[in-house]
Amino acid sequence: MSTEHKAKAVHFNVDTALSVTTHSRPLRKKSQIPTFSSPRAYAIAMPFDEMLARAKKENPDVQKLIDERGLRQEIAAVNLMVAKLCDKACEIWPNAFMVLVDERYFRAPLQCIGLADNTHRINRTLPTADELQQIRDRLDINGAEFKLGWYRDMYPDQHI
């Protein structure tokens, strides 16, 4: 017995061959994430004073708690407000996350709403301009103080 196998040519009927041909798909241009030497997050800056004012407006008891407990309560109120806004942003952009960015861009470390990062594979896509505008409108953050950009991420492993 021979263990040698010979390849056989396969021929299709002309009608079958035409139905098997693949059709080209439209090419979608993907947004490219720039290369950085350190962990960065594409985020919308949420200014501390603005977030504190929103927290006080949403819940008048916040001011009383701040008077009793001081700066720690202010920080907690701002973090809670940013978390709520992040949840709203997730309705439009599911990859949204809270991120703490480096103080070299602001006068203190700042909580931001992250939309993409250069550290995690699942967060490497960027929202479209239309999605960004929807997020800004939904969160009412259209002012110049809500800057969008690539910021140094202080704790990249905490927002997976």
Residue ranges and their predicted role:
Residues 71-125:
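Short, intrinsically disordered low-complexity segments
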Residues 51-54, 65, 77, 81-88, ...:
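Charge-rich, solvent-exposed alpha-helical interaction surfaces
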Residues 18-23, 79, 125-132:
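A short linear-motif detector with a strong N-terminal bias
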Residues 59-60, 69-70, 86-94, 124, ...:
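Short, flexible coil/linker elements and helix-boundary hinge sites characteristic
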Residues 1-75, 148-160:
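Short, extreme N-terminal segment that most often corresponds to the first beta-strand
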